[in-house]
Amino acid sequence: MRPLRHAVGSSTVTLETDLTLFPEDLHAPLLGSAGNATVDELALAARFDGLHQLLYTRGGVRPTNAAIEEVGKLLLLRLWLSRDDEASVDGVGLRALFDGAVPDESVVEVTKKAFTQVLTVDRMSLRAVDGSSRPLWPYDEPFRLAEPTVLQSALALVNEILGGGTRVADPLGTAFDAFLSGRYDHSGGLGTYLTPSSVARMMAEVVLDLLSSDALADVRAPIIADPFCGTGRFLVAAFDAAEERHENVDLAGLLDGGLVGADQSTTAIAKSGLNLLLYGAQQPEVYAVADSMTDPGLDRLRGTLAAVLTNPPFGGGKYDDALGIDRTRELFPSVRPNRPMDPRLLDSRCLSNFCDPGESLG
């Protein structure tokens, strides 16, 4: 067992990790979206697991989804610092905040103000369906982590993740993997189910092998989408697979407009957009929609995409949107109008419509 001690402010927080054995409640998935789990990824998952325990027992942030939300906000702040070394709030530089130089008595207030400010920075935003910019979180979204010692530890961990100058595969997905397996998440369901990263990566590799290199060489419009994007796991898996398996890929074009995500959940959109920003996107195209299958903004993609990668919603006869049911009856005439149905039927009908004829749906 190797302790990781962070001296932050006036406190020292110790996170226990073991890089040779998984914690008893952490299984051994292929963490992140990398094809093979590296020591760095396993160490990151172990640190997230330790941070999860701190947040849950001492941070006052529950449930797991809320804890991951606060970690995501800190990742956004650290990314802002990476893109602007002079970033500051009320005369306090973000560099000092992440280096542990802000004392415990003021670290919470400084972090709250910094988070409010970063939401107004245009180059840390998302691109909406109409082409305008919008913040990852609403402008009035609060920063909720208010225990100074735990916040200092979280700042130190985030600084480690983004301060090394190398890209970390799917950090938010890795956080979910670790947090979802955490031993303290027993008070109610999370309501979030992630496709295992190994499955997402396998699907991305198969689909990307079917695409021609020419399709990826000059990306000027959306070519790969996930209409139910969650944390963006399929989108970053597609990017990783394209980067590794094709030559002369327009990586910048792929990140800024070539990959498109949509989701009903605004918090999922924040995580997905942040994941793409962490990969280098300048302004990711991820949208919050009322219904991914009937949203007018997504209708523009129908019949245009080279690939759709997704894990659609499922379960029960609970879908009752009249337009969605009418669209489904075009493929499944036996579906009764004006009666709730299993959303998987709608997904089969409409997801195939997103793709250009002859292209791939995963």
Curated annotation (Swiss-Prot):
Function statement: A gamma subtype methylase that recognizes the double-stranded sequence 5'-GATNNNNATC-3', methylates A-? on both strands, and protects the DNA from cleavage by the MamI endonuclease.
Catalytic activity: a 2'-deoxyadenosine in DNA + S-adenosyl-L-methionine = an N(6)-methyl-2'-deoxyadenosine in DNA + S-adenosyl-L-homocysteine + H(+)
Gene Ontology terms describing biological process: DNA restriction-modification system; methylation
Matches recorded under PROSITE patterns: N6_MTASE
Record Pfam families: N6_Mtase (PF02384)
Record protein name field: Type II methyltransferase M.MamI
EC number from the UniProt entry: 2.1.1.72
Family: Belongs to the N(4)/N(6)-methyltransferase family.
